Design a protein with these regions (language model features):
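Short beta-alpha connecting loops at secondary-structure transitions
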Residues: 3, 26-34, 121-125, 162, ...
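Conserved thiamine diphosphate
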Residues: 35, 43, 49, 195-234
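Short gly/pro/ser/thr-enriched loop/turn and capping motifs at secondary-structure boundaries
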Residues: 1-2, 23-27, 33, 43-44, ...
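Thiamine diphosphate
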Residues: 12, 109-187
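Active-site diphosphate/adenylate-binding microenvironment
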Residues: 64-142, 148
């Protein structure tokens, strides 16, 4: 899933080196000067070996700005919990080689932007097909494939309800996972898009069950975050349990439009 070349190459005057497993498609805004087709891992290593070091500081500046953004709300105690704070606490509570399976919704926008990854396949997001409901069964699969690692399903309340019955599977097979539910009683991403495009929302709110009692009905542990400072210890305790834990975490999505406004002021130069 990528932006069409006409959005980032309107001038059509740049030199483009195409590095992919397949040949480039013909496009007026994507006229390549060189194609490196093959295993991307090996291709990048070979290209890196023959290129000259980049002396510019643009990437360093970008990296520093991202780090600043990631750290901005680390000590924020407002409630409901800001998306940035949830991600900070989650990243801090988990080891770097633990695994996150991210569902689809407003939380996916925040996770893909701000969740720091140091190892391959430690943050898996359904981005192409954008399949709501992937997080819980995906976390079960990840734990089966990597029983030595902690696994967390990060999901919105809507995505969680689409496949939450798979808690039964996890309990029956004794698969210990953590399910972190970002609770806003809404289709958060659709609400975000409606606010951006129309300045209002329509038919996106719904009523949730009691997620704590719902988890307990399967024999799992259910915990509700009632103060922001509770989130970190709740996460750590959940990661240490040898069973399924569902964490109901109210999220403050008033941050969404602030992010939209900030991103609208950015300009990418290539």
């Amino acid at each position: 899933v990528e932006y069409h070349p006409y959005l980032w190459h309107p001038s059509r005057d740049r030199t483009i080196v195409h590095i992919d497993t397949t040949h480039a498609e013909v496009d007026g805004h994507y006229s390549i000067s060189l194609a490196v087709v093959g295993n991307i891992r090996h291709s990048l290593n070979r290209v890196a070996a023959i290129t000259t070091p980049h002396q510019g500081k643009a990437m360093r500046t970008l990296r520093d700005s991202l780090i600043t953004e990631m750290n901005m709300h680390r000590d924020d105690l407002e409630f409901p919990v800001k998306p940035q704070k949830i991600i900070w606490d989650l990243r801090t509570a988990m080891d770097l080689q633990d695994i996150v399976i991210c569902d689809v919704g407003a939380h996916k926008m925040w996770m893909s932007r701000m969740f720091r990854c140091e190892y391959p396949n430690t943050c898996i997001i359904s981005n192409g097909f954008a399949s709501m409901g992937i997080a819980v069964p995906g976390a079960i699969a990840a734990k089966l494939a990597n029983p030595q690692r902690k696994v967390v399903a990060v999901t919105g309340d809507a995505g969680f309800l689409m496949n939450s019955q798979e808690i039964e599977t996890a309990m029956r097979l004794n698969i210990a996972i953590v399910i972190l539910v970002w609770n806003d009683a809404s289709y958060g991403l659709i609400e975000w898009k409606q606010q951006n495009q129309f300045g209002r929302t329509s038919h996106v709110q719904f009523t949730n069950p009691d997620f704590v009692q719902y988890a307990q009905s399967f024999g799992a542990v259910g915990v509700r975050v009632e103060e922001t400072e509770q989130l970190m210890p709740i996460l750590k305790e959940a990661l240490d349990r040898n069973t399924v834990t569902v964490i109901d975490c109210p999220v403050d999505y008033r941050e969404n439009l602030k992010l939209t406004e900030a991103l609208g002021q950015l300009t990418l130069t290539i």
